[in-house]
């Protein structure tokens, strides 16, 4: 199964259509009834998530009838859907509004993530910003590219060491309590640590060379499959903290993505205590 240029154009335009019709009109216009919780008080779902996922699922389901369509909200309603991913020759994985907490609170730091996988291996990844209408995209046989209304250019991460201490994204709130203190102790040797509460924009920042690494927990294919491919095809390194290859089928462990193999090794050594 190979994606043609026409296929990837259709996927992109479907995502842009969902953003125009379902996501942006609701931004900063949600009522309390439009916002609900899922697994925790800060795990939110909005009317925009549901409507955008429904639109993308319907349109791509018609275009790719043999594909498994795996949306975050569909899996929330029926977790067994995720079990089909490993055996799917083609799966389209959708995060309709990544960074829902930001979106629901009126912070313009959210995106749409879409990945296509083959038996769990990412072969296409899209990181789309509905606010600016720009995107970073990659596929298994192409460079990672950034595109907006005026420009399109290939992204290539530098192989040279960072000019300052390596800085990146670590979701402290997702780590077990004892590990948070260990991470805090790393600050003097690593540099700035942040979290955007949005994997889409964290991967975008890494792919453009604006940060040096990102550590991901709570593995979900809609958050990570696209970004892993984007980083790898830009010349970076993205694999599990234990050194094994990433698969969208994985449900546990830590994913470490970095601008280069050397930075990956440096950060992996610093965070190796998470493997104990």
Predicted regions located by residue number:
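DPxDG-like acidic metal-binding loop motif
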Residues: 82-144
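Solvent-exposed alpha-helices and their adjacent loops that cap or buttress functional pockets
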Residues: 37, 83-86, 137, 160-164, ...
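An extended, acidic
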Residues: 158-276
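N-terminal subdomain of lithium-sensitive/metallo-dependent phosphomonoesterases centered on the IMPase/IPPase/PAP
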Residues: 1-97
